[in-house]
């Protein structure tokens, strides 16, 4: 019984270290390379990430014919490739599961490509929720 409980705890702790629910200030810090990229302020990016994934780096959303991955909910039909959609255009030239870790480097590179190709309104939350009153998305701890 003791080994079962130990194994269960290890499984829970392992899972908890795999998923990363970031805080606003952590996102603000990790996205600093996006500051003013394409005319989009850092608070806009932080707000967009919150309303897109809730700052969950392992967020996966299944839609009718596609799946979206990670902090920025990057779509597998156009931007990345996975087993579900092997004929993706894969513009970011990356496996979608790379967007599910806490290293946001590849997420940021792909987000820049998305911004360059289709603009910030790729993320529907931006226009509706992240284009005004952005003071709440600043992080004073930095």
From Swiss-Prot:
PANTHER family: ALPHA-LACTALBUMIN, LYSOZYME C. One of its GO terms (biological process) is lactose biosynthetic process. It comes from the Eukaryota. Belongs to the glycosyl hydrolase 22 family. The keyword Transferase does not apply. Residues 1-19 form the signal peptide. Disulfide bonds join 25-139, 47-130, 80-96, 92-110. Residues 20-142 form the C-type lysozyme domain. Glycans are attached at residues 64, 93. The gene is LALBA. Regulatory subunit of lactose synthase, changes the substrate specificity of galactosyltransferase in the mammary gland making glucose a good acceptor substrate for this enzyme. This enables LS to synthesize lactose, the major carbohydrate component of milk. In other tissues, galactosyltransferase transfers galactose onto the N-acetylglucosamine of the oligosaccharide chains in glycoproteins. The keyword rRNA-binding does not apply. It holds the Pfam family Lys. Keywords: Calcium, Disulfide bond, Glycoprotein, Lactose biosynthesis, Metal-binding, Milk protein, Secreted, Signal. Ca(2+) binds at residues 98, 101, 103, 106-107. One of its GO terms (molecular function) is lactose synthase activity. This is Alpha-lactalbumin. Lactose synthase (LS) is a heterodimer of a catalytic component, beta1,4-galactosyltransferase (beta4Gal-T1) and a regulatory component, alpha-lactalbumin (LA). Mammary gland specific. Secreted in milk. GO terms for cellular component: extracellular region; protein-containing complex. It is found in: Secreted.
